[in-house]
Amino acid sequence: MKPFARRALLTAEPIRALLLAASLLAATLGLMPAEAFGASRIKDIADFEGVRDNMLVGYGLVVGLNSTGDSLTNAPFTKESLTGMLERLGVNIRDKTGAISSQLTPKNVAAVMITATLPPFSRQGTRIDINVSAMGDAKDLRGGTLLVTPLIGADGEVYAVGQGQVATGGFTASGASGSSVTKGVPTAGRIANGAIVERELPFEMSHLESVKVSLRNPDFTTSRRIAQAINSFLGGDMARPVDPGTVQIAVPPGYRGNVVGLLTDVEQLRVEPDQMARVVVDEVSGTIVMGENVRISTVAIAQGQLTIRITETPQVSQPSPFSDAGTTTTVQRTDIQVDEGAGNKLAVVPHKVTLQELVEGLNSLGIGPRDLITILQAIKAAGALQAELEVL
């Protein structure tokens, strides 16, 4: 009997260890505040003022195309650009009268626009990606090489210089009869690490006495919660909401000269953002997206021979007998009834219900998204939809 008893003991030990680990995990989750599960980091819902990207643009030429470039008769700017580039390189292509030679008709050159994004705190010598897009009637940029092109900012200064081979996501194939097949967009491409930063943006953070936090979705409640979270962390009245989209932080004495450390600590704080009740519908694709706080007031709906009645009945929920925790609360029981017969009268809805409950009732009948969009627009027109309806 003893060997069997020892085997049973060895089998029970891992089970006890798992139960103990599960108990510790449950206790740990129970100690965590409920807000932490729905909270987001400040860095995920806001930006720091001054820390942003900058747009760059440039004009250049792509060469080396396989007879898929611009036709110089239809794109005179390509001819002028090619002429100016060759003259700067010491190549004379003008006749005795000074006019551009009519024999200059290459098919492997295309005029393009270059766009790029300059990340914040980019230093000289770092590389950034650039996008290349055809301007003329070029059919395909695949295999072409972008010549040296300066990229300028909104202030007219050159911040980067781009050059390299263009990679496209499409292609064009044509036959002798004139028929062609195009896949993707062969007239737009990308050059990974195709530009070198030549000028840095002048921005110094160490001397700042205050920092502003810019919310990506401005909201009064969210900005106040961010200020409260920062003040709770710093232990003083250092942050205040200026408007729904801005929270101003005064740099504490302990962070003077170390603003980067302050922003590092602040962006890790968690805040539960508040959202405005909104319903977004896309009539083209039939997509419906709704927020959590969407509610419907008293309304009766009928579409053709379809009648929907929504009622809510309050019920009392009590904890089990001899329970140490729990309170008696009142909950709403929702009842959705749908009649498809003719001759039914509209029923008045006496209480507010969520839009999700209404949509679930309609979906159970197989009503398509486009009919749902029509119903939602009618509810909004009646003033019963307590949310913003945005139609794309």
Swiss-Prot record:
Keywords: Bacterial flagellum, Periplasm, Signal. InterPro entries: Flag_FlgI. Disulfide bonds: none annotated. It is found in: Periplasm; Bacterial flagellum basal body. GO terms for molecular function: structural molecule activity. One of its GO terms (cellular component) is outer membrane-bounded periplasmic space. The keyword Signal applies. Assembles around the rod to form the L-ring and probably protects the motor/basal body from shearing forces during rotation. The basal body constitutes a major portion of the flagellar organelle and consists of four rings (L,P,S, and M) mounted on a central rod. Belongs to the FlgI family. This is Flagellar P-ring protein. It comes from Paramagnetospirillum magneticum (strain ATCC 700264 / AMB-1).
